[in-house]
Amino acid sequence: MLREKYGHPDIAISVDGQPGSDWLISYFSDQVRNGVSFKAGQTVQVGWALLKLADGDAGELTVSEPDFASMPVHWVGGSSRVMRHLILQREVCDQIGEEPCFPSMIQPGVVSPSFVGGRSAFTMSRDDEGWLFKADDDDGEGARLCSLYAVGIERTAVIPFLALPPGAVVEWKSGSAEIEFKGQRYSSQSNSFLDRLLASPALI
């Protein structure tokens, strides 16, 4: 369709019926209609994550996403994980009445020593400089920079909250999560969406 209308290579998207697939198809169509030219090797940010374009066998461009399991990034065909994250992050922001403020997965966050690879309760807070991740059993010494992607593949629980705006604080522990923003607190104990999110980690 893109080739016939605009002389641009078609973009083949495998979405497996994932909600939001129509939005992604429309996004690429609208961009091409507005004069944007996509090429093999290019990455496109969707939500917090990146999609990567590659040459297909029939002259089209294919879409790949990170597998969210490997470091460095391993690209696999499809976009279902990226779209799922986009929907979850939008919905989390909707719970506090704010528009998403998407970072990029390649941006750094500050992490305390035992946060990555740990399973203890943690706090994540965002300011104008980015995200800070702190395990509750750390004293704050020895913090280091780590890409948000590396943080996310080790502690998937952070992913739904990454688009919260600066000023947000998330307190997470097994069985509960609480967001604090502008003096208001939103808890999984009283918020049905946050409660479902904790109960269904496969959503992430």
Where are these regions (language model features)?
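N-terminal leader/presequence regions that precede the main folded/catalytic core
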Residues: 1-54
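Short, compact, well-ordered microdomains
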Residues: 43-74, 150-188
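Polybasic, proline/glycine-rich intrinsically disordered low-complexity segments
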Residues: 182-204
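Short, basic/low-complexity N-terminal boundary segments at the transition from targeting/disordered tails
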Residues: 22-30, 34, 99-115, 152-154
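A short, structured beta-strand/loop element
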Residues: 125-138
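Extended amphipathic alpha-helical regions
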Residues: 120, 143-144, 153-157
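A short, exposed loop/beta-hairpin motif centered on an aromatic-Gly-Thr core
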Residues: 11-15, 145-150
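Surface-exposed beta-loop interaction hotspot
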Residues: 47-123
